[in-house]
């Protein structure tokens, strides 16, 4: 029974005794009527001879009465007829007792509740305990309208069925009956008044739902019944209950919410039951609980959040249970706890922070447990108990006390270490407990060496001799002597009988399923038997596989070294923890450091990313998950790197708690191989998934109608986009296109080229593109106009119409020249150029081989890539060709086995630019213009007729040729005669039809738009010995497929007039770039070095100054 309840009961008994004595005093002051002495009061209040009168109490108990004594005095207010043999009460015998209030009929032979007649209405207390009453009938009680206390204990009542009548009852005692069942609603009529209900010592095995609808009830006792399970909401309706006692019921299970509704309950006693666990489920709703008594149960576990709903708890009794460990969450939330009793358990493990939250704790009882290591090895096990006053560690098998064992107990006043065979205490182990008033210590096992010298003096200084009974066990000379009887000089260190750790176990990592060992060694000078133990996470390993060895440290020595090996086989994740060896003998125990074991497992995929094909604009979802130990980290890569287009555009999402990788609004550039990598300390694995994006066909360039003159080449564009790349098909006038030898297709049918167009070619051309996602169609209208008649004078400036006719001529001449003479011309030029510059060129190398095989017009954005140049291996493999890009990609001329040059269908795309009047910046008459390293058309002489090159080529250029990048200069010289120039050209073995073309071209040099110019002869060299070489395709100055023109920078303020004589002009040719037509302007006025005249040959300079229009600026073109 708790102290508060005892105090309350004692106070009640004291008040009752005072009242009785007061009434007795008043009775005695008026005379002793029961003794027959004369008195006025006694004469008025006669007392039966068989009874005793004490105030208003008539005590007729223990008289073995079979019937009531008559007559009963009318003044009686309290009548005690207990312990008699009454079996029947006449109502008439009490009818005159108008003052009667209390009747006690305990321990009689009544079988029913007696009828007391008219006085029943005045009775407030009726005690019928210890009778033979078998049932409670409402009609027997309905007359007791003033009844407040009814005691029916120790009767034969077995059922509570018929509801109680509506009485003013406050206290109802039904203890020690035979009640086995209760009818719900049995006490409902007492709901407004009943305060205390006791049903102890019955045979109740279950409490029906809604049994207690007693909102005023404050105390309910159900001790010593047979209640095994308590269901949820069992006590609903007892909102005012202050205490509930269910001791000795054999309760094994408390369901969640078992005490819900008892929000005002302060005391819960569940002692002597069979509970095994404390959980927050059955404590739910006990918000005001202050005392919880759970002693004498079988509790072995406290759940981490058990105290969530009862944080006002001030006293907790867990004595005599089966607790073996106190975790850091065992008492979490009990900041108001004042007293904690955990004595007589099996506690052998206390976490470092087990008591950290008990900031208000004043009494901690841990007696009779097994927590020796807490004091011996742990540092600050009681830290956080700032207000602790009383600590009981009696009977815990403590053998040694370290210096920091009681760290944090600054306010401790009472420390009980009795019944512990303590062998050693480190110096100043109690020094920080400044307020200590009592230290209880009794041991006869002390190792009285130099380390114990401080203890007797400290005990004497603090006047603890009356509480300390300590004697020595070693050395043999001091055995059995009290420490207070040993002089300070008697505490010496001649040996070390207590084991000392010499080899500490080491921290290790292991792969799951492998075997490993921990090794620990200690030395001792004693021959006392050694015991070895291993702990994991401060808990003893009972079934550990150990190997123990002993050997002398040195020959002839007296020091023994002991080694223990802990073997762990097929380690699992549960094997992880901190391992510690404990080596002990009769003189104490030594604890090693704690070695940590980490168990790793290689990652393995539980979810592997799968190849995904998805439409553009949709959301891509890639899953990847892996398991391992430690948990692996998941990382993603795209195409072997971390450059995600979706990440740059913030379209990529990776959920940290999820296994999914998202890309929203998928685009073509998201196509690639995505790699998922799972990595931990044991290793890494990866898995790949290919993302394919599908896009419906679309036109990357608008379809433009074309108008050409009869005989010209017509180029129709249909630049297609989509994924997978769409297939193209051309139709004419909604009918299949009849393909003739004049029809050519290029770039995957994206270009339709019609050579020598005829009026019959005019019409509506439909481009149909299709892939797996759909089909798209577009129309292009081709108009062919008849050949106009134009008589333009030779010496007049050409108009835009003249230039159109010139374009037609260029196309015709380009085709003829390419088929007949191009191969021979370039072979001759390249061969002699290489021989001329072989000595001054830089060393060739074959190590540079840049790819030039990606057509830029196929980019997914639908725009052309930047100009790309590169080198490709020549056919012979000994040299490289310099290759410049055109709008349609990189092009090389194709030769058949006879050396004949064929038209490259891909390069026909540039024909369009050549035939577009607004894309040709070079107007006026032209002449042959050659410079080594410059860029020219596919036919060396097309420029003569057109003023611009449809498909430029690099002339006489070796790879990395110095002359390509060096400064070219122009020198004044005497004008050679027409014959000398003609003779210079005639030295070359031209085909007859080419020679005719050259002669015709040369005759134009007399026009007003031409000036003779002499160049360094090294710039051009013709030889009759051809050498097989490849000629690289280069970029045009004109844009293709809408690409920006690569025009030279023009001088907006260039002069209209040019000097008639040749002024020195210099310009630079940069690698992989077009010639800068005005670059020489920056070098005007500087000196040049003249070459000898014999090194000069004849060339021409084109001027456009006489034909400047508002749309085209005039400038000089040096080539």
Swiss-Prot record:
Sugar-bearing residue positions: 122, 156, 274, 442, 469, 515, 688, 729, 905, 987, 999, 1016
Membrane-spanning intervals of the chain: 810-830
Expressed in which tissues: Widely expressed.
Signal peptide annotation: 1-24
PANTHER family: KEKKON 5, ISOFORM A (PTHR45842:SF12), SYNAPTIC ADHESION-LIKE MOLECULE SALM (PTHR45842)
Reported function: May play a role in craniofacial and inner ear morphogenesis during embryonic development. May act within the otic vesicle epithelium to control formation of the lateral semicircular canal in the inner ear, possibly by restricting the expression of NTN1.
Entry protein name: Leucine-rich repeats and immunoglobulin-like domains protein 3
């Amino acid at each position: 029974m708790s102290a508060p309840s005892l105090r309350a009961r004692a106070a009640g008994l004291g008040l009752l005794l005072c009242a009785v004595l007061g009434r007795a005093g008043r009775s005695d002051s008026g005379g002793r009527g029961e003794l027959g002495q004369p008195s006025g009061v006694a004469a008025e209040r006669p007392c039966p001879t068989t009874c005793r009168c004490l105030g208003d109490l008539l005590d007729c108990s223990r008289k073995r009465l079979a019937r009531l004594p008559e007559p009963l005095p009318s003044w009686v207010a309290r009548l005690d007829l207990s312990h008699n043999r009454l079996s029947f009460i006449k109502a008439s015998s009490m009818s005159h007792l108008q003052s009667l209030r209390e009747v006690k009929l305990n321990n009689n032979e009544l079988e029913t509740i007696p009828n007391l007649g008219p006085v029943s209405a005045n009775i407030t207390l009726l005690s019928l305990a210890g009778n033979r009453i078998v049932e409670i009938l409402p009609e027997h009680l309905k007359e007791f309208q003033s009844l407040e206390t009814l005691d029916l204990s120790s009767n034969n009542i077995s059922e509570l069925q018929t509801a109680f009548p509506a009485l003013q009852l406050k206290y109802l005692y039904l203890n020690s009956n035979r009640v086995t069942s209760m009818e719900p609603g049995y006490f409902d009529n007492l709901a407004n008044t009943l305060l205390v209900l006791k049903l102890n010592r019955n045979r109740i095995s279950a409490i029906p739902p809604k049994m207690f609808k007693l909102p005023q009830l404050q105390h309910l006792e159900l001790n010593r019944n047979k209640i095994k399970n308590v269901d949820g909401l069992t006590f609903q309706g007892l909102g005012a209950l202050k205490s509930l006692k269910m001791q000795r019921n054999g309760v094994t299970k408390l369901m969640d919410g078992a005490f819900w509704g008892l929000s005002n309950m302060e005391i819960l006693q569940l002692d002597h039951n069979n509970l095994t666990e404390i959980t927050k489920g059955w404590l739910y709703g006990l918000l005001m609980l202050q005392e919880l008594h759970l002693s004498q149960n079988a509790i072995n576990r406290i759940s981490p959040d058990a105290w969530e709903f009862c944080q006002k708890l001030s006293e907790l009794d867990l004595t005599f249970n089966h607790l073996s460990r106190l975790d850091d969450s065992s008492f979490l939330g009990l900041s108001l706890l004042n007293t904690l009793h955990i004595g007589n358990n099996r506690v052998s493990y206390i976490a470092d922070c087990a008591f950290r939250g008990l900031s208000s704790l004043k009494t901690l009882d841990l007696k009779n447990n097994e927590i020796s290591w807490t004091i011996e090895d742990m540092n600050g096990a009681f830290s956080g108990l700032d207000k602790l006053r009383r600590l009981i560690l009696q009977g815990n098998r403590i053998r040694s006390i370290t210096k920091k064992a009681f760290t944090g107990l600054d306010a401790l006043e009472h420390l009980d270490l009795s019944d512990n065979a303590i062998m050693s205490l480190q110096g100043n182990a109690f020094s920080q407990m400044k307020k200590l008033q009592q230290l209880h210590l009794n041991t006869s096992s002390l190792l009285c060496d130099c380390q114990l010298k401080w203890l007797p003096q400290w005990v004497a200084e603090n006047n603890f001799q009356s509480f300390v009974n300590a004697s020595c066990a070693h050395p043999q000379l001091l055995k059995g002597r009290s420490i207070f009887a040993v002089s300070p000089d008697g505490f010496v260190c001649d040996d070390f009988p207590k084991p000392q750790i010499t080899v500490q176990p080491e921290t290790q990592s292991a792969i799951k399923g492998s075997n490993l060992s921990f090794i620990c060694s200690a030395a001792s000078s004693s021959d006392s038997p050694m015991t070895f133990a291993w702990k994991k996470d401060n808990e003893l390993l009972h079934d550990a596989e150990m190997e123990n060895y002993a050997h002398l440290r040195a020959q002839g020595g007296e020091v023994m070294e002991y080694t223990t090996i802990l073997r762990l086989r097929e380690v699992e994740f549960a094997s992880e923890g901190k391992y510690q060896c404990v080596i002990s003998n009769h003189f104490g125990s030594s604890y090693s450091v704690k070695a940590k074991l980490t168990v790793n497992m290689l990652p393995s995929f539980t979810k592997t990313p799968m190849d995904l094909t998805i439409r553009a604009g949709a959301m891509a979802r890639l899953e990847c998950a892996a398991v391992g130990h430690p948990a692996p980290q998941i990382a993603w890569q795209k195409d072997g790197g971390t450059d995600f287009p979706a990440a740059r555009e913030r379209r990529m999402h990776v959920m940290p708690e999820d296994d999914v990788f998202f890309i929203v609004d998928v685009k073509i550039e998201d196509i690639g191989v995505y790699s998922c990598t799972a990595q931990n300390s044991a290793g890494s694995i990866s898995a790949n998934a290919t993302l394919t994006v599908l896009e419906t066909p679309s036109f990357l360039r608008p379809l433009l109608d074309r108008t050409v003159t009869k005989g010209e080449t017509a180029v129709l564009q249909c630049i297609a986009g989509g994924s997978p790349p769409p297939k193209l098909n051309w139709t004419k006038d909604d009918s299949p296109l009849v393909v003739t030898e004049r029809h050519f297709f290029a770039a995957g049918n994206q270009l339709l080229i019609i050579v020598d167009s005829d009026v019959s070619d005019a019409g509506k051309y439909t481009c149909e593109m299709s892939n797996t996602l759909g089909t798209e169609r577009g129309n292009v209208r081709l108009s062919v106009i008849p050949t106009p008649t134009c008589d333009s004078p030779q010496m007049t400036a050409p108009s835009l119409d003249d230039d159109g006719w010139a374009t037609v001529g260029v196309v015709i001449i380009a085709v003829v020249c390419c088929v007949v003479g191009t191969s021979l011309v370039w072979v001759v030029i390249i061969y002699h150029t290489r021989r001329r510059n072989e000595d001054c060129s830089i060393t060739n190398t074959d190590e540079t081989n840049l790819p030039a095989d990606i057509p830029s017009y196929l980019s997914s954005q639908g725009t052309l890539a930047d100009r790309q140049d590169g080198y490709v291996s020549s056919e012979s493999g000994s040299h490289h060709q310099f290759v410049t890009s055109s709008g349609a990609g990189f092009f090389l001329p194709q030769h058949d086995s006879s050396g004949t040059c064929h038209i490259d269908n891909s390069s026909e795309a540039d024909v369009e630019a050549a035939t577009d009047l607004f894309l040709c910046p070079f107007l006026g008459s032209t002449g042959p213009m050659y410079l080594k390293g410059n860029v020219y058309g596919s036919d060396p002489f097309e420029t003569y007729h057109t003023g611009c090159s449809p498909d430029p080529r690099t002339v006489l250029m070796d790879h990395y040729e110095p002359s390509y990048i060096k400064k070219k200069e122009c020198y004044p010289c005497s004008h050679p005669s027409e014959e000398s120039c003609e003779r210079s050209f005639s030295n070359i073995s031209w085909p007859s039809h080419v020679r005719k073309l050259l002669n015709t071209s040369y005759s134009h040099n007399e026009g007003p738009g031409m000036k003779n110019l002499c160049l360094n002869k090294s710039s051009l060299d013709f030889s009759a010995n051809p050498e097989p070489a490849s000629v690289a395709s280069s970029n045009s100055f004109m844009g293709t497929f809408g690409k920006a023109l690569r025009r030279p920078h023009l001088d907006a303020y260039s002069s209209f007039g040019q000097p008639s004589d040749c002024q020195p002009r210099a310009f630079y040719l940069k690698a992989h770039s077009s010639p800068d037509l005005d670059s020489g302007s920056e070098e005007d006025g500087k000196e040049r070095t003249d070459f000898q005249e014999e090194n000069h040959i004849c060339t021409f300079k084109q001027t456009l100054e006489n034909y400047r229009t508002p749309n085209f600026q005039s400038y000089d073109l040096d080539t």
